[in-house]
């Protein structure tokens, strides 16, 4: 089985990316092949916090690669920072490059991080998007705060909260269960 975690932050090395990396480790315990597509590292649009603007050819290549990875995935995880009480425009832009054919009847997990007030609102908004794309948003979701993470000596963030580590295990187990027991396989 293949999975794809889409990180919708404009910042390289974001908390959302750290959560995605933690989840890859959890998916590994189920022998699943899971990739991270970090929109900060492979932009599909012009917003870039690094101060560089990717060329149109690079953007076109990234879009094609993104579409192929989404289509090939058996499940998706959408990750977003909390931007003004909702999901990021970068993630919205990425989702605008796919349609129902890419997501139809696939399990979709939702994860997010807030630097300020902890909020699951961005994930609630994404549930509507997943439903519109005919995907199946799994019930368990993860909404973390910057304080749930610590930094290694090299500055790399990692999830350092036992409660969220337990929730991450439940989240992954639930997605795996949906993938392995889908009654909708014939509808794809």
Swiss-Prot record:
Keywords: Flavoprotein, FMN, NADP, Oxidoreductase. InterPro entries: Flavoprotein-like_sf, FMN_Rdtase-like_dom, NAD(P)H-dep_reductase. Its EC number is 1.7.-.-. One of its GO terms (cellular component) is cytosol. It comes from the Bacteria. Homotetramer. Belongs to the azoreductase type 2 family. Catalyzes the reductive cleavage of azo bond in aromatic azo compounds to the corresponding amines. Requires NADPH, but not NADH, as an electron donor for its activity. This is FMN-dependent NADPH-azoreductase. The lineage of its organism: Bacteria, Bacillati, Bacillota, Bacilli, Bacillales.
């Amino acid at each position: 089985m293949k999975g794809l975690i889409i990180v919708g932050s404009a910042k390289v090395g974001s908390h959302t990316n750290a959560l995605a990396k933690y989840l890859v480790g959890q998916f590994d315990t189920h022998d699943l092949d899971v990739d991270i597509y970090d929109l900060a590292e492979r932009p599909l649009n012009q917003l870039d916090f690094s101060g560089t603007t990717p060329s149109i050819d690079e953007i076109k290549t990234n879009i094609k690669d993104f579409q192929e990875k989404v289509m090939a995935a058996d499940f998706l995880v959408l990750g977003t920072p909390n931007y003004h009480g909702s999901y990021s425009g970068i993630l919205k832009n990425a989702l605008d490059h796919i349609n129902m054919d890419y997501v139809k009847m696939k399990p979709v997990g939702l994860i997010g991080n807030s630097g300020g007030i902890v909020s699951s609102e961005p994930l609630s908004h994404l549930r509507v998007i997943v439903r519109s794309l005919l995907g199946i948003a799994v019930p368990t979701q993860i909404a973390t705060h910057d304080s749930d993470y610590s930094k290694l000596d090299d500055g790399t963030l990692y999830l350092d909260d036992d409660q969220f580590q337990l929730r991450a295990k439940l989240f992954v187990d639930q997605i795996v269960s949906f993938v392995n027991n889908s009654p909708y396989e014939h509808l794809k």
